[in-house]
Amino acid sequence: MFNNKMILIAGPCVIEGEDITLEIAGKLQSILAPYSDRIQWFFKSSYDKANRSSLNSFRGPGLTEGLRILAKVKETFGVGILTDVHTPQDAYAAAEVCNILQVPAFLCRQTDLLVATAETGAIVNLKKGQFLSPWDMEGPINKVLSTGNNKILLTERGCSFGYNNLVSDMRSIPVLSRSGFPVIFDATHSVQLPGALSTESGGLTEFVPTLSRAALAAGAHGLFIETHTNPKIAKSDAASMLSLEEFAALLPTWDQLFTCVSSFDMVSA
């Protein structure tokens, strides 16, 4: 499905408007162009952040306008698109534009959502819930497979560790890989501090380099990275996104690590 290339899913947390979305996509395209023979990248952004900490937090432009903007990104830059779907009713509309439909971590056991998303025929990115062990993902995987769709990605995004904290257990990478589906490591959501800032989540982006390197060394097939021109003023996940400059600086290391690890057989866990 991905021709043994590293998978890189990148973009801002939420669609903040057409101009800024196109700007970020264009800069990512330029950054990633030299790696096109080794990295398959997808632009990601959300049309609706339905699980914000506060009722008053920015959620995005909504389904219709959001998909219009994502379609323009796809047409302008020729890049594959990922967005997350929160209700079964949105799945088919989203699949008309997006190559990958993402089931959010909090919703990864919702049968109707999983089935509706899979029935579109799009690639389904299943994010492992913060409350689940990697072994528990067998159930969500089987719900997707029940539709006849076997185009699945599995994403590790950390596990709840007490209050307002997440930890990343790298044992999850080989465990999820046993499914036979590519495993993605979400290096920016994994450094979140959920609810730590009262009405929004905090984050420890200084650990993104370490965790992303560890995941690739453990055999991850790719990375999920949220990035922005200016994370400090981003309307969602400001504390856990990388700047485009930070993203570009880490890219050579990610490329080298993936190439290195792919060159030898991983010992089975």
Curated annotation (Swiss-Prot):
Lineage: Bacteria, Pseudomonadati, Chlamydiota, Chlamydiia, Chlamydiales
The UniProt record lists the keyword Electron transport: no
Protein name: 2-dehydro-3-deoxyphosphooctonate aldolase
Pfam families the record matches: DAHP_synth_1
Entry-linked InterPro entries: Aldolase_TIM (IPR013785), DAHP1/KDSA (IPR006218), KDO8P_synthase (IPR006269)
Chain's gene name: kdsA
SUPFAM superfamilies: Aldolase
Family matches, as HAMAP family: KDO8P_synth (MF_00056)
Pathway membership, UniProt: Carbohydrate biosynthesis; 3-deoxy-D-manno-octulosonate biosynthesis; 3-deoxy-D-manno-octulosonate from D-ribulose 5-phosphate: step 2/3; Bacterial outer membrane biogenesis; lipopolysaccharide biosynthesis
GO molecular function terms noted in the UniProt entry: 3-deoxy-8-phosphooctulonate synthase activity
Reactions the enzyme catalyzes: D-arabinose 5-phosphate + phosphoenolpyruvate + H2O = 3-deoxy-alpha-D-manno-2-octulosonate-8-phosphate + phosphate
Location in or out of the cell: Cytoplasm
Keywords: Cytoplasm, Lipopolysaccharide biosynthesis, Transferase
Gene Ontology CC entries for this record: cytoplasm
Native organism: Chlamydia pneumoniae (Chlamydophila pneumoniae)
GO biological process: keto-3-deoxy-D-manno-octulosonic acid biosynthetic process
Entry keyword Protein transport: no
